[in-house]
Protein backbone atom coordinates (compact mmCIF):
# COMPACT_ATOMS: atom_id res chain seq x y z
CA UNK A 1 0.00 0.00 0.00
CA UNK A 2 1.86 3.07 -1.23
CA UNK A 3 -0.16 5.36 1.04
CA UNK A 4 1.38 3.65 4.05
CA UNK A 5 4.88 4.79 3.13
CA UNK A 6 6.18 8.03 4.63
CA UNK A 7 9.57 9.68 4.17
CA UNK A 8 10.76 8.98 7.72
CA UNK A 9 10.34 5.25 7.17
CA UNK A 10 12.14 4.98 3.86
CA UNK A 11 14.87 7.64 4.29
CA UNK A 12 17.44 5.18 5.73
CA UNK A 13 16.94 2.96 2.69
CA UNK A 14 17.06 5.57 -0.09
CA UNK A 15 19.87 5.14 -2.57
CA UNK A 16 21.20 7.88 -4.82
CA UNK A 17 22.36 6.35 -8.08
CA UNK A 18 25.42 7.79 -9.79
CA UNK A 19 23.81 9.12 -12.95
CA UNK A 20 27.12 10.07 -14.54
CA UNK A 21 27.69 6.34 -15.04
CA UNK A 22 24.57 6.09 -17.23
CA UNK A 23 25.18 4.73 -20.73
CA UNK A 24 23.13 4.28 -23.89
CA UNK A 25 22.45 1.02 -25.74
CA UNK A 26 25.86 1.21 -27.37
CA UNK A 27 27.69 1.65 -24.08
CA UNK A 28 28.40 5.34 -24.59
CA UNK A 29 28.19 7.69 -21.63
CA UNK A 30 25.03 9.80 -21.69
CA UNK A 31 26.68 12.74 -19.94
CA UNK A 32 29.44 14.92 -21.33
CA UNK A 33 32.49 15.84 -19.26
CA UNK A 34 32.12 18.52 -16.62
CA UNK A 35 35.15 20.78 -16.09
CA UNK A 36 35.15 23.10 -13.09
CA UNK A 37 37.27 26.26 -12.94
CA UNK A 38 37.80 28.12 -9.67
CA UNK A 39 38.26 31.87 -10.19
CA UNK A 40 39.70 33.39 -7.02
CA UNK A 41 39.43 37.16 -6.77
CA UNK A 42 41.76 39.33 -4.70
CA UNK A 43 41.11 42.86 -3.50
CA UNK A 44 43.86 45.29 -4.50
CA UNK A 45 44.40 49.00 -3.93
CA UNK A 46 41.69 49.79 -6.46
CA UNK A 47 39.17 47.96 -4.27
CA UNK A 48 40.42 48.69 -0.76
CA UNK A 49 37.10 50.33 0.15
CA UNK A 50 35.24 47.23 -0.98
CA UNK A 51 37.41 45.20 1.39
CA UNK A 52 36.61 47.63 4.21
CA UNK A 53 32.92 47.37 3.35
CA UNK A 54 33.06 43.58 3.59
CA UNK A 55 34.75 43.78 6.98
CA UNK A 56 32.29 46.36 8.31
CA UNK A 57 29.21 44.47 7.11
CA UNK A 58 30.59 41.17 8.45
CA UNK A 59 31.24 42.73 11.86
CA UNK A 60 27.74 44.18 11.97
CA UNK A 61 26.17 40.88 10.85
CA UNK A 62 28.15 38.71 13.29
CA UNK A 63 27.40 40.91 16.28
CA UNK A 64 23.69 41.25 15.50
CA UNK A 65 23.33 37.57 14.60
CA UNK A 66 24.72 36.41 17.94
CA UNK A 67 22.29 38.71 19.75
CA UNK A 68 19.35 37.56 17.62
CA UNK A 69 20.06 33.91 18.44
CA UNK A 70 19.15 34.56 22.08
CA UNK A 71 15.50 34.59 20.99
CA UNK A 72 15.75 32.70 17.72
CA UNK A 73 12.02 32.11 17.25
CA UNK A 74 11.08 35.77 17.66
CA UNK A 75 13.98 37.03 15.54
CA UNK A 76 13.75 34.68 12.54
CA UNK A 77 13.03 37.52 10.08
CA UNK A 78 16.00 39.49 11.38
CA UNK A 79 18.21 36.40 11.16
CA UNK A 80 17.15 35.90 7.55
CA UNK A 81 17.89 39.57 6.82
CA UNK A 82 21.39 39.20 8.25
CA UNK A 83 21.98 36.11 6.11
CA UNK A 84 20.91 38.09 3.04
CA UNK A 85 23.21 40.99 3.92
CA UNK A 86 26.22 38.73 4.37
CA UNK A 87 25.59 37.11 1.01
CA UNK A 88 25.02 40.47 -0.67
CA UNK A 89 28.30 42.02 0.44
CA UNK A 90 30.25 39.43 -1.58
CA UNK A 91 27.81 39.65 -4.49
CA UNK A 92 28.03 43.32 -5.42
CA UNK A 93 28.36 46.72 -3.80
CA UNK A 94 25.19 47.74 -5.63
CA UNK A 95 23.20 44.93 -4.01
CA UNK A 96 24.35 45.52 -0.43
CA UNK A 97 23.96 49.29 -0.71
CA UNK A 98 20.41 48.97 -2.04
CA UNK A 99 19.45 46.57 0.74
CA UNK A 100 21.02 48.69 3.48
CA UNK A 101 19.27 51.83 2.24
CA UNK A 102 15.91 50.08 2.18
CA UNK A 103 16.49 48.76 5.69
CA UNK A 104 17.42 52.23 6.94
CA UNK A 105 14.26 53.73 5.46
CA UNK A 106 12.15 51.07 7.17
CA UNK A 107 13.71 51.91 10.54
CA UNK A 108 13.41 55.67 10.06
CA UNK A 109 9.74 55.28 9.13
CA UNK A 110 9.22 52.82 12.01
CA UNK A 111 7.67 50.19 9.75
CA UNK A 112 9.22 47.17 11.47
CA UNK A 113 7.23 44.07 12.38
CA UNK A 114 7.92 40.71 14.00
CA UNK A 115 6.97 38.76 10.86
CA UNK A 116 5.79 35.16 10.63
CA UNK A 117 8.89 33.42 9.32
CA UNK A 118 9.54 30.08 11.02
CA UNK A 119 12.88 28.34 11.40
CA UNK A 120 11.71 25.40 9.30
CA UNK A 121 11.00 27.84 6.46
CA UNK A 122 14.65 28.89 6.13
CA UNK A 123 15.79 25.89 4.10
CA UNK A 124 12.96 26.33 1.59
CA UNK A 125 12.77 30.12 1.43
CA UNK A 126 14.26 31.72 -1.64
CA UNK A 127 16.09 34.99 -1.17
CA UNK A 128 13.95 36.77 -3.74
CA UNK A 129 10.76 35.55 -2.07
CA UNK A 130 11.73 36.41 1.50
CA UNK A 131 13.64 39.67 1.23
CA UNK A 132 10.56 41.91 1.41
CA UNK A 133 9.47 40.56 4.79
CA UNK A 134 13.03 40.40 6.08
CA UNK A 135 13.68 44.09 5.35
CA UNK A 136 10.92 44.96 7.83
CA UNK A 137 12.23 42.71 10.61
CA UNK A 138 11.98 44.13 14.10
CA UNK A 139 15.20 45.75 15.33
CA UNK A 140 17.03 44.68 18.48
CA UNK A 141 18.17 48.27 19.08
CA UNK A 142 16.72 50.73 16.60
CA UNK A 143 18.83 53.77 17.46
CA UNK A 144 22.06 51.79 17.39
CA UNK A 145 21.14 50.01 14.16
CA UNK A 146 20.23 53.29 12.43
CA UNK A 147 23.61 54.75 13.34
CA UNK A 148 25.48 51.64 12.19
CA UNK A 149 23.56 51.49 8.92
CA UNK A 150 24.34 55.13 8.14
CA UNK A 151 28.05 54.45 8.57
CA UNK A 152 27.97 51.33 6.40
CA UNK A 153 25.92 53.03 3.67
CA UNK A 154 28.38 55.93 3.59
CA UNK A 155 31.24 53.49 3.03
CA UNK A 156 29.23 51.56 0.41
CA UNK A 157 28.72 54.77 -1.58
CA UNK A 158 32.44 55.50 -1.48
CA UNK A 159 33.30 51.95 -2.52
CA UNK A 160 30.82 52.08 -5.38
CA UNK A 161 32.32 55.28 -6.77
CA UNK A 162 35.94 54.24 -6.14
CA UNK A 163 35.98 51.52 -8.78
CA UNK A 164 33.92 48.72 -10.26
CA UNK A 165 33.64 45.62 -8.08
CA UNK A 166 36.69 43.37 -7.86
CA UNK A 167 34.84 40.46 -9.49
CA UNK A 168 33.92 42.43 -12.61
CA UNK A 169 37.30 42.46 -14.36
CA UNK A 170 37.81 38.67 -14.05
CA UNK A 171 34.24 38.15 -15.27
CA UNK A 172 34.78 40.28 -18.36
CA UNK A 173 38.11 38.58 -19.04
CA UNK A 174 36.56 35.11 -18.86
CA UNK A 175 33.63 36.01 -21.10
CA UNK A 176 35.90 37.74 -23.62
CA UNK A 177 38.10 34.64 -23.79
CA UNK A 178 35.17 32.20 -24.06
CA UNK A 179 33.27 34.05 -26.77
CA UNK A 180 36.31 35.15 -28.77
CA UNK A 181 37.26 31.48 -29.10
CA UNK A 182 33.78 30.41 -30.21
CA UNK A 183 31.02 32.97 -30.80
CA UNK A 184 28.40 30.21 -31.00
CA UNK A 185 28.82 29.34 -27.32
CA UNK A 186 26.24 30.62 -24.87
CA UNK A 187 27.10 31.74 -21.35
CA UNK A 188 24.83 31.52 -18.31
CA UNK A 189 25.64 33.73 -15.31
CA UNK A 190 23.97 32.91 -12.00
CA UNK A 191 23.58 35.44 -9.21
CA UNK A 192 21.41 35.44 -6.10
CA UNK A 193 20.30 39.06 -6.35
CA UNK A 194 18.34 41.15 -8.84
CA UNK A 195 20.46 44.23 -8.02
CA UNK A 196 23.60 42.34 -9.03
CA UNK A 197 21.82 41.04 -12.12
CA UNK A 198 20.98 44.60 -13.21
CA UNK A 199 24.54 45.75 -12.48
CA UNK A 200 26.05 42.99 -14.62
CA UNK A 201 23.54 43.47 -17.42
CA UNK A 202 24.52 47.13 -17.78
CA UNK A 203 28.23 46.30 -17.76
CA UNK A 204 27.95 43.56 -20.37
CA UNK A 205 25.64 45.52 -22.68
CA UNK A 206 28.09 48.43 -22.53
CA UNK A 207 30.79 45.91 -23.44
CA UNK A 208 28.87 45.14 -26.64
CA UNK A 209 27.35 41.79 -25.67
CA UNK A 210 23.75 40.70 -26.19
CA UNK A 211 22.18 39.86 -22.83
CA UNK A 212 18.95 38.24 -21.62
CA UNK A 213 17.87 38.32 -17.98
CA UNK A 214 15.54 36.12 -15.95
CA UNK A 215 14.43 36.45 -12.32
CA UNK A 216 11.67 35.32 -10.01
CA UNK A 217 9.68 38.52 -10.48
CA UNK A 218 8.90 37.74 -14.11
CA UNK A 219 5.63 36.21 -15.32
CA UNK A 220 5.39 32.87 -17.13
CA UNK A 221 5.04 34.65 -20.47
CA UNK A 222 8.07 36.83 -19.73
CA UNK A 223 10.09 33.78 -18.70
CA UNK A 224 9.19 31.91 -21.88
CA UNK A 225 10.05 34.94 -24.00
CA UNK A 226 13.40 35.29 -22.22
CA UNK A 227 14.20 31.62 -22.80
CA UNK A 228 13.39 31.89 -26.49
CA UNK A 229 15.42 35.08 -26.83
CA UNK A 230 18.48 33.46 -25.26
CA UNK A 231 18.13 30.32 -27.34
CA UNK A 232 17.87 32.17 -30.65
CA UNK A 233 19.36 35.65 -30.30
CA UNK A 234 21.61 36.45 -27.34
CA UNK A 235 24.96 35.17 -26.09
CA UNK A 236 24.65 35.77 -22.35
CA UNK A 237 21.87 34.79 -19.95
CA UNK A 238 21.88 36.27 -16.43
CA UNK A 239 19.54 34.45 -14.05
CA UNK A 240 18.77 34.49 -10.37
CA UNK A 241 18.20 31.16 -8.62
CA UNK A 242 14.44 31.78 -8.39
CA UNK A 243 14.30 32.65 -12.08
CA UNK A 244 16.28 29.59 -13.11
CA UNK A 245 14.20 26.98 -11.27
CA UNK A 246 13.07 24.14 -13.51
CA UNK A 247 14.78 25.40 -16.65
CA UNK A 248 16.27 23.16 -19.32
CA UNK A 249 19.24 25.05 -20.76
CA UNK A 250 21.21 22.22 -22.36
CA UNK A 251 21.70 24.29 -25.53
CA UNK A 252 24.26 26.22 -23.44
CA UNK A 253 27.38 24.66 -21.94
CA UNK A 254 29.03 27.48 -19.94
CA UNK A 255 27.93 28.42 -16.41
CA UNK A 256 29.48 31.22 -14.38
CA UNK A 257 28.53 31.16 -10.71
CA UNK A 258 29.13 34.84 -10.04
CA UNK A 259 27.74 34.29 -6.54
CA UNK A 260 28.46 30.95 -4.91
CA UNK A 261 25.51 29.71 -2.83
CA UNK A 262 26.41 28.50 0.65
CA UNK A 263 24.59 25.24 0.03
CA UNK A 264 26.50 22.97 -2.42
CA UNK A 265 23.18 21.43 -3.46
CA UNK A 266 22.17 24.75 -5.02
CA UNK A 267 25.34 24.79 -7.08
CA UNK A 268 24.45 21.30 -8.31
CA UNK A 269 20.96 22.48 -9.22
CA UNK A 270 22.44 25.29 -11.30
CA UNK A 271 24.84 22.95 -13.07
CA UNK A 272 21.98 20.56 -13.73
CA UNK A 273 20.37 23.15 -16.01
CA UNK A 274 22.99 22.36 -18.67
CA UNK A 275 24.70 19.17 -17.45
CA UNK A 276 22.03 16.73 -18.53
CA UNK A 277 21.25 14.08 -21.13
CA UNK A 278 21.20 15.66 -24.56
CA UNK A 279 24.06 18.09 -23.92
CA UNK A 280 26.30 18.07 -27.00
CA UNK A 281 29.42 19.73 -25.55
CA UNK A 282 31.58 19.40 -22.49
CA UNK A 283 30.21 21.56 -19.68
CA UNK A 284 32.42 24.25 -18.16
CA UNK A 285 31.61 25.67 -14.72
CA UNK A 286 33.35 28.83 -13.48
CA UNK A 287 33.03 29.42 -9.74
CA UNK A 288 33.85 32.95 -8.58
CA UNK A 289 35.00 33.46 -4.99
CA UNK A 290 36.67 36.35 -3.18
CA UNK A 291 39.80 34.92 -1.58
CA UNK A 292 40.13 37.11 1.51
CA UNK A 293 36.80 36.16 3.08
CA UNK A 294 35.49 33.80 5.72
CA UNK A 295 33.19 32.39 3.03
CA UNK A 296 36.21 31.22 1.08
CA UNK A 297 37.74 29.61 4.16
CA UNK A 298 34.51 27.69 4.84
CA UNK A 299 34.41 26.64 1.18
CA UNK A 300 38.01 25.38 1.31
CA UNK A 301 37.45 23.28 4.43
CA UNK A 302 34.10 22.02 3.18
CA UNK A 303 35.50 21.00 -0.19
CA UNK A 304 38.38 19.19 1.50
CA UNK A 305 35.91 17.12 3.50
CA UNK A 306 33.61 16.59 0.53
CA UNK A 307 36.46 15.50 -1.73
CA UNK A 308 37.37 12.72 0.70
CA UNK A 309 33.78 11.50 0.81
CA UNK A 310 33.30 11.75 -2.94
CA UNK A 311 36.55 9.88 -3.56
CA UNK A 312 35.54 7.08 -1.23
CA UNK A 313 32.17 6.80 -2.99
CA UNK A 314 33.67 7.01 -6.45
CA UNK A 315 31.36 9.82 -7.55
CA UNK A 316 31.89 13.43 -8.48
CA UNK A 317 28.58 15.05 -7.62
CA UNK A 318 27.62 16.61 -4.29
CA UNK A 319 24.03 15.57 -4.86
CA UNK A 320 25.01 11.91 -4.54
CA UNK A 321 26.16 12.56 -0.98
CA UNK A 322 24.19 15.38 0.60
CA UNK A 323 20.59 15.26 1.76
CA UNK A 324 18.88 18.35 0.33
CA UNK A 325 16.36 18.35 3.18
CA UNK A 326 19.02 19.27 5.75
CA UNK A 327 21.84 20.82 3.75
CA UNK A 328 20.59 24.42 3.63
CA UNK A 329 20.08 24.90 7.38
CA UNK A 330 23.32 23.13 8.24
CA UNK A 331 25.48 25.12 5.85
CA UNK A 332 23.84 28.45 6.59
CA UNK A 333 24.50 27.98 10.28
CA UNK A 334 28.12 27.01 9.59
CA UNK A 335 28.73 30.16 7.58
CA UNK A 336 26.95 32.50 9.97
CA UNK A 337 28.75 31.14 13.04
CA UNK A 338 32.06 31.44 11.21
CA UNK A 339 31.63 35.11 10.25
CA UNK A 340 34.03 36.98 12.48
CA UNK A 341 35.38 33.68 13.85
CA UNK A 342 37.48 32.19 11.04
CA UNK A 343 39.41 30.02 13.50
CA UNK A 344 36.19 28.17 14.37
CA UNK A 345 35.43 26.96 10.83
CA UNK A 346 36.65 23.40 11.42
CA UNK A 347 34.68 23.12 14.65
CA UNK A 348 31.54 24.56 13.07
CA UNK A 349 31.71 21.97 10.29
CA UNK A 350 31.77 18.95 12.62
CA UNK A 351 27.97 18.36 12.54
CA UNK A 352 27.88 18.60 8.74
CA UNK A 353 30.83 16.25 8.41
CA UNK A 354 29.13 13.72 10.68
CA UNK A 355 25.95 13.88 8.58
CA UNK A 356 27.89 13.36 5.36
CA UNK A 357 29.80 10.42 6.81
CA UNK A 358 26.54 8.81 7.91
CA UNK A 359 25.12 9.14 4.42
CA UNK A 360 28.34 7.69 3.04
CA UNK A 361 28.00 4.67 5.33
CA UNK A 362 24.40 4.11 4.21
CA UNK A 363 25.32 4.50 0.54
CA UNK A 364 28.17 2.00 0.77
CA UNK A 365 26.02 -0.51 2.61
CA UNK A 366 23.08 -0.42 0.23
CA UNK A 367 24.74 0.46 -3.08
CA UNK A 368 24.19 -2.94 -4.69
CA UNK A 369 20.59 -3.36 -3.57
CA UNK A 370 19.06 -1.76 -6.66
CA UNK A 371 20.86 -4.31 -8.84
CA UNK A 372 19.21 -7.23 -7.06
CA UNK A 373 15.91 -8.72 -8.10
CA UNK A 374 13.37 -9.07 -5.31
CA UNK A 375 10.03 -10.84 -5.26
CA UNK A 376 7.94 -8.09 -3.68
CA UNK A 377 4.87 -10.28 -3.46
CA UNK A 378 6.64 -12.59 -1.02
CA UNK A 379 7.91 -9.67 1.03
CA UNK A 380 4.90 -7.46 1.57
CA UNK A 381 2.05 -9.91 1.79
CA UNK A 382 -1.42 -8.44 1.52
CA UNK A 383 -2.35 -4.78 1.77
CA UNK A 384 -4.06 -5.28 5.11
CA UNK A 385 -0.95 -6.50 6.92
CA UNK A 386 1.67 -4.53 5.00
CA UNK A 387 4.54 -3.70 7.36
CA UNK A 388 6.75 -1.10 5.68
CA UNK A 389 9.68 -1.35 8.07
CA UNK A 390 9.94 -5.13 8.03
CA UNK A 391 9.44 -5.31 4.26
CA UNK A 392 12.20 -2.83 3.57
CA UNK A 393 14.57 -4.45 6.02
CA UNK A 394 13.89 -7.86 4.49
CA UNK A 395 14.69 -6.44 1.05
CA UNK A 396 18.01 -5.14 2.32
CA UNK A 397 19.19 -8.36 3.94
Label each region the model flagged.
Residues 1, 23-61, 240-326, 330:
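SF2 helicase/translocase ATPase core recognition
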Residues 2, 6, 49-53, 57, ...:
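Helical mechanochemical/support elements of P-loop NTPase systems and associated helical scaffolds
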Residues 29-46, 71-75, 84-90, 94-235, ...:
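Conserved Helicase C-terminal RecA-like lobe
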Residues 53-77:
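Short amphipathic alpha-helical segments and their helix-coil junctions
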Residues 281-397:
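C-terminal accessory region of SF2 helicases/translocases
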